[in-house]
Design a protein with these regions (language model features):
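Polar/charged alpha-helical tracts
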Residues: 106-110, 224, 240
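Class I S-adenosyl-L-methionine-dependent methyltransferase catalytic core
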Residues: 1-218, 249-251
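Amphipathic alpha-helical oligomerization segments
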Residues: 215-227
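Basic/aromatic-rich interaction segments and small domains that mediate binding to polyanionic partners
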Residues: 231-247
């Protein structure tokens, strides 16, 4: 089965604990090169959309990952999640009931206080973004009123707001869709994740293979829709899908 809409929350591996809150201690993470070897291109429709979460630490890696999966990034700001503290809703509702928040300035002050203060080497982070990338001609936008910014309370570590999934459904309608790196179920979606007991498919990173040098020639690696020409000096070639065909071509 191929999917027209792929929604992914990659398990980024952070090296700076100031910037991420030690993600590896809360859930399984993967190196970028390992995620690139997931055969996502083999499950994507020839015309598909990828909506992928990333943080500012991984902006360039997110673009590389989308490209490795066969997608071209169209915007880095498909959605922006402004994170509120877990108890923000109850505190705001209490302020309204007690009439301690009575005008616009009070509201804006409260909203600013209730946005989280994460780590950061410059300013303190409180947002996370979803890029939009396409394969082929992508998908038709069915609803032109879908907004970018999502205000939502923070949940479990790395848990993303369901509102983004709902907006994607409204944006693209009833297409075949899958959520990658998921940890639960959602109606109308297929799922894959290494911590998800409800997987609908299995994705395994492709391994490396060693190809002996070929005199006066190059090696063309055909994997899915990829077509990578490698230099003679390279002895290892990355496989980006389950089946790889090798073809000798003129130098």
């Amino acid at each position: 089965m191929s999917y027209q809409l792929i929604y992914a929350d990659p398990a980024w591996q952070y090296s700076n604990k100031i910037s991420n809150g030690a993600a590896g201690g809360h859930y399984s993470t993967m190196a970028v090169e390992e995620m690139k070897r997931l055969p996502v291109s083999s499950i994507a429709d020839e015309n598909a959309v990828l909506a992928m979460w990333y943080t500012g630490n991984f902006a360039s890696e997110a673009v590389e990952l989308a490209h490795a999966w066969g997608f071209k990034v169209k915007t880095m700001k498909g959605f922006t999640w402004v994170k509120l503290y877990e108890q923000a809703r109850s505190r705001i509702e209490r302020a309204l009931a007690e009439q301690t928040m009575i005008d616009f300035e009070d509201f804006m002050d409260t909203l600013n206080v209730e946005t989280v203060m994460n780590g950061g080497n410059y300013t303190r982070g409180n947002t996370e973004d979803v890029l939009i990338a396409v394969r082929g001609s992508g998908l038709e936008r069915l609803n032109a009123s879908i907004k970018q910014v999502v205000y939502s309370c923070r949940g479990e570590h790395s848990e993303k707001p369901a509102e983004v999934r709902f907006r994607l459904e409204e944006l693209y309608g009833q297409v075949s869709r899958i959520e990658l790196f998921s940890r639960g179920e959602a109606s109308g979606w297929h799922h894959w994740g290494n911590e998800n007991p409800f997987n609908d498919i299995e994705l395994v990173p492709a391994s490396f293979t060693t190809i002996p040098p070929m005199r006066n020639s190059r090696v063309k690696v055909l994997a899915g829709h990829y077509q990578a020409l490698t230099p003679l000096s390279a002895s290892k070639h990355q496989i980006s899908a389950g089946i790889v065909y090798l073809q000798e071509v003129a130098a």
